[in-house]
Curated annotation (Swiss-Prot):
A GO molecular-function annotation: chorismate synthase activity
Protein name stated in the entry: Chorismate synthase
Broad class of enzyme this protein falls into: lyase
Source species: Geobacter sulfurreducens (strain ATCC 51573 / DSM 12127 / PCA)
Pathway info: Metabolic intermediate biosynthesis; chorismate biosynthesis; chorismate from D-erythrose 4-phosphate and phosphoenolpyruvate: step 7/7
Length: 393
């Protein structure tokens, strides 16, 4: 079983993650992790903090000479802005300063419900941890999971498919071409014409003091049939993936395959017919069974069916607006216009990178549940033995 915990506040000294359950012998490096961290900080519409932070992960435990050794892996990302917050975010009681308490909660954030739940009179105790800054360390953990999946020929790729109601058209693009186009895009999208309209929409929102949401699409390819299970509700892979993606800050909806559109179609236009071709095995495919459509998004009954997993997630517009929304001061109960923290206009491209990470983590966990071992070699032997069985089925 693969599990992880993250810790740290947005303006604290660092973000930390501990990963448990990685097999020994997996090659990882801080360079590969930092590549994904850099992608998270890119994207059209990002805010001022991206000019301060240049995220770099440090591997503190569980890795020796570039390979995991079987013990927990610890990662940390230093917050470079900490130098400006040392007293405001100090763990020491001697630095307490009631004059800097934040009592004005912002609509759309965890501020007010969090303060009421934890009996805080200072909203900063909530907003620091609820901030999307936390996703930086989840991207780092996800990069490790992606390295594990890559050793089995499995890829997880994220794209922006919609911004502000402007949709990218995939048409007949194959996955490799989508990857090439999105890598060259400031919005991580594969439709150049739609990208220009998206950027113009973001520019308009910036001028109006507003923010923009959108939709990200995650495609996982190279997966075998049989990950997840139908036997219990909490073992269904689609349920676990949906929870992982919904855990990302500002995500308000998740769909797999056709998703909500399946409710609008007759069954004859929804379910993927099954075919068999024995020559697929000689061509390097994992199974002779296949489907000509993928409306299920690669999962049936909570189990992977051998097709690509396709997930889409809706991200709401960032709630911190430069044209402030109305709220109420927790202490005085007086109305006010919400305070402005540094913020993005559009963080949908970053959400695509974060969604990649959490999906990779859940898939790596499913792989280890199915083919687990103490070393990567043992996991690979179990995996290859299973593939022999599947090819002969």
């Amino acid at each position: 079983m693969l599990r992880y915990l993250t810790a740290g506040e947005s303006h604290g000294p660092q973000l930390t993650a501990i990963i448990e359950g990685l097999p020994a012998g997996l090659k990882i490096s801080d360079e590969s992790i930092n590549c994904d961290l850099a992608r998270r900080q890119c994207g059209y519409g990002r805010g001022g903090r991206m000019k301060i932070e240049r995220d770099e992960a440090q591997i503190l435990s569980g890795v020796r000479w570039g390979e995991t050794i079987g013990s927990p892996v610890t990662l940390c990302i230093v917050n470079r802005d900490w130098i400006n917050w040392q007293e405001k975010m100090s763990p020491n009681a001697r630095h307490r300063d009631e004059k800097i308490r934040v009592t004005r909660s912002r609509p759309g954030h965890a501020d007010l419900p969090g303060a009421m739940k934890y009996d805080h009179r200072d909203v900063r105790n909530i907003l620091e941890r609820s901030s999307a800054r936390e996703t930086a360390v989840r991207v780092a953990v996800g990069a490790v999971a992606k390295a594990f999946l890559a050793s089995f020929g499995i890829e997880v790729n994220g794209f922006v498919s919609e911004v502000g109601g402007i949709r990218a058209e995939r048409r007949s693009l194959q996955l490799e071409r989508m990857k090439e186009l999105s890598a060259a895009s400031e919005l991580f999208t594969y439709d150049a014409e739609a990208e220009e309209r998206m950027k113009a929409f973001i520019d308009g929102a910036r001028e109006a003091g507003d923010t923009v949401g959108g939709v990200v699409e995650i495609i996982a390819s190279g997966l075998p049939v049989g990950l997840g299970s139908h036997v219990q509700w909490d073992r269904k892979l689609d349920a676990r993936l949906a929870m992982a993606v919904m855990s990302i800050q500002a995500i308000k909806g998740v769909e797999i395959g056709l998703g909500f559109d399946a409710a609008r179609r007759p069954g004859s236009q929804v379910h993927d017919e099954i075919y068999y071709d024995s020559t697929r095995i000689s061509r390097g495919e994992l199974s002779g069974f296949y489907r000509k459509s993928n409306n299920a998004g690669g999962i049936e009954g909570g189990i992977t069916n051998g097709e690509d997993i396709v997930i889409r997630a809706a991200m709401k517009p960032i709630p911190t607006l430069y044209r402030p929304l109305r709220s109420v001061d927790m202490q005085t109960k007086e109305p006010f216009e919400a305070t402005v923290e540094r913020s993005d206009v559009c963080a949908v491209p970053a959400a695509a990178v974060v969604a990649e990470a959490v999906v990779a983590l859940e898939l790596a966990n499913a792989m280890l549940e199915k083919f687990g071992g103490d070393s990567l070699g043992e996991v690979r032997r179990n995996y290859e033995g299973y593939l022999e069985y599947v090819r002969a089925f």
